[in-house]
Amino acid sequence: METLTAISRWLAKQHVVTWCVQQEGELWCANAFYLFDAQKVAFYILTEEKTRHAQMSGPQAAVAGTVNGQPKTVALIRGVQFKGEIRRLEGEESDLARKAYNRRFPVARMLSAPVWEIRLDEIKFTDNTLGFGKKMIWLRNSGTEQA
């Protein structure tokens, strides 16, 4: 099974991402519902600019984060660790992402928060359902996939 396909399939079934941002030695993490775009390998989220994590991000920043389920046994652990870049979307790019986000989360129509993109550059997917400690790695720039 192709690594990115397996990762994308799993991410499409989840809905909460945690990401962390750093500014001048200070770290902060946040959680949000996300829409995953498998073609761009990116999450789309809504978050207000006044939040601590948005203030630390500025218009764009490096991030790292996770998406994980809540299994009751170690054998069922599945999750993603990633690094990438967050940026606030503007104009048509923002409008298109918001429409797609609103289709997945209709309640978001009530929110005026800006749309942000978290572009993933490296993904490590742990899937213990394929065997304890099974890891798959995807890297954007090298096209490398490791199983």
Curated annotation (Swiss-Prot):
It comes from the Bacteria. Signal peptide: none annotated. InterPro entries: Split_barrel_FMN-bd, UPF0306. Coiled coil: none annotated. HAMAP family: UPF0306. Belongs to the UPF0306 family. This is UPF0306 protein YhbP. It comes from Escherichia coli O17:K52:H18 (strain UMN026 / ExPEC). The gene is yhbP.
